Amino acid sequence: MIPVRCFSCGKVISNYWDEYKRRVSDGENAAAVLDDLGITRYCCRRMLLSHVELVDVLSPYQ
């Protein structure tokens, strides 16, 4: 699950995750997608760039 807010500045970033993931999986450049979405702060950019979905990996162990 993507965090709702950026850990550093507190900006809401979770509403960008679905579109970011879809467009990057379609082959667009991640930096261009972030620029297009208006995410300019490097702290917010790293939240989306470095996020890894672990829910599906960890769910069998509960």
Curated annotation (Swiss-Prot):
Ranges that cross the membrane: none
Record's catalysed reaction(s): RNA(n) + a ribonucleoside 5'-triphosphate = RNA(n+1) + diphosphate
Gene Ontology CC: one annotated term: DNA-directed RNA polymerase complex
Pfam families hit by this protein: RNA_pol_N
Enzyme class at the top of the EC tree: transferase
Entry cofactors: Zn(2+)
Main location: cytoplasm
Keywords: Cytoplasm, DNA-directed RNA polymerase, Metal-binding, Nucleotidyltransferase, Transcription, Transferase, Zinc
Binding site for Zn(2+): C6, C9, C43, C44
Localization annotation: Cytoplasm
A GO MF label: DNA-directed RNA polymerase activity
Source species, domain of life: Archaea
Biological process (GO), any one: DNA-templated transcription
Cofactor binding, per record: Binds 1 zinc ion.
EC assignment: 2.7.7.6
HAMAP family: RNApol_arch_Rpo10
Similarity comment: family membership: Belongs to the archaeal Rpo10/eukaryotic RPB10 RNA polymerase subunit family.
Subunit structure, as described in the record: Part of the RNA polymerase complex.
Functional summary from the UniProt entry: DNA-dependent RNA polymerase (RNAP) catalyzes the transcription of DNA into RNA using the four ribonucleoside triphosphates as substrates.
Protein name as it appears in the record: DNA-directed RNA polymerase subunit Rpo10
Origin species: Methanosarcina barkeri (strain Fusaro / DSM 804)
Taxonomic lineage of the native organism: Archaea, Methanobacteriati, Methanobacteriota, Stenosarchaea group, Methanomicrobia
